[in-house]
From Swiss-Prot:
Reactions mediated catalytically: (2S)-2-hydroxy-3-oxobutyl phosphate + 5-amino-6-(D-ribitylamino)uracil = 6,7-dimethyl-8-(1-D-ribityl)lumazine + phosphate + 2 H2O + H(+)
EC number(s) on file: 2.5.1.78
List of residues binding (2S)-2-hydroxy-3-oxobutyl phosphate: E87, T88, R129
Cellular component GO terms held in the UniProt record: cytosol; riboflavin synthase complex
SUPFAM superfamilies, per the entry: Lumazine synthase
Name of the protein: 6,7-dimethyl-8-ribityllumazine synthase
Lineage: Bacteria, Pseudomonadati, Pseudomonadota, Betaproteobacteria, Burkholderiales
Listed GO MF terms: 6,7-dimethyl-8-ribityllumazine synthase activity
UniProt record similarity statement: Belongs to the DMRL synthase family.
PANTHER family: 6,7-DIMETHYL-8-RIBITYLLUMAZINE SYNTHASE, 6,7-DIMETHYL-8-RIBITYLLUMAZINE SYNTHASE DMRL SYNTHASE LUMAZINE SYNTHASE
Biological function: Catalyzes the formation of 6,7-dimethyl-8-ribityllumazine by condensation of 5-amino-6-(D-ribitylamino)uracil with 3,4-dihydroxy-2-butanone 4-phosphate. This is the penultimate step in the biosynthesis of riboflavin.
């Protein structure tokens, strides 16, 4: 049996991408952002189609993402941050709440969000992961923006088929 299959599309030309970057653990977050922006450019996203905003910490990321999503100007969003374990429960709170908020915004607004908020045990782990995670966030944003647009067209095609059937009746 042959089945239809969507092939991943990493062509970024014409896509509008919003990035929200935490300033807490700034060296790591700057490394994430540098790698992400470099990869977006490699994928064909124009610098004029990227907006980067910064927020104090990971817990503020969801609100900024929500504001960008509400604008309707973006094909995908990216969350960048670093939560590094300390000696208190705060690590779990920030990790869980920021992640849940990021996911909720994407689902509420039907908008892809690449979550590149690192959660690590120490600074060394964060530094070791920042470059590849930044690049990965760019690839996820571009691929998911293209996928959601392609899937949205499926709905448009079904509406056209229904309109054709009504015209024939």
């Amino acid at each position: 049996m042959e089945i239809g299959q969507y092939q991943p599309n990493l062509e970024g030309d014409g896509l509008r991408i919003g990035i929200v970057q935490s300033r807490f653990n700034e060296p790591v977050c700057n490394g994430l952002a540098d790698a992400c922006v470099e990869e977006l450019e490699r994928l064909g996203v124009s610098g004029e189609d990227v907006l980067l905003v910064s927020v104090p910490g990971a817990l503020e990321i969801p609100l900024a993402l929500q504001k960008l999503a509400e604008s309707g100007q973006f094909d995908a969003l990216i969350a960048l941050g670093a939560v590094i374990r300390g000696e208190t429960y705060h690590f779990e709170l920030v990790s869980n709440e920021s992640g849940a908020g990021i996911t909720r915004i994407g689902l509420d607004f039907n908008l892809p969000i690449a979550n590149a908020v690192l959660t690590t045990e120490n600074d060394e782990q964060a530094v070791a992961r920042m470059t590849e995670k930044g690049r990965d966030a760019a690839r996820v944003a571009v691929e998911m923006a293209n996928l959601t647009m392609a899937l949205d067209q499926l709905g448009d095609d079904e509406e056209e088929d229904e309109d054709d059937e009504e015209e024939r009746a």
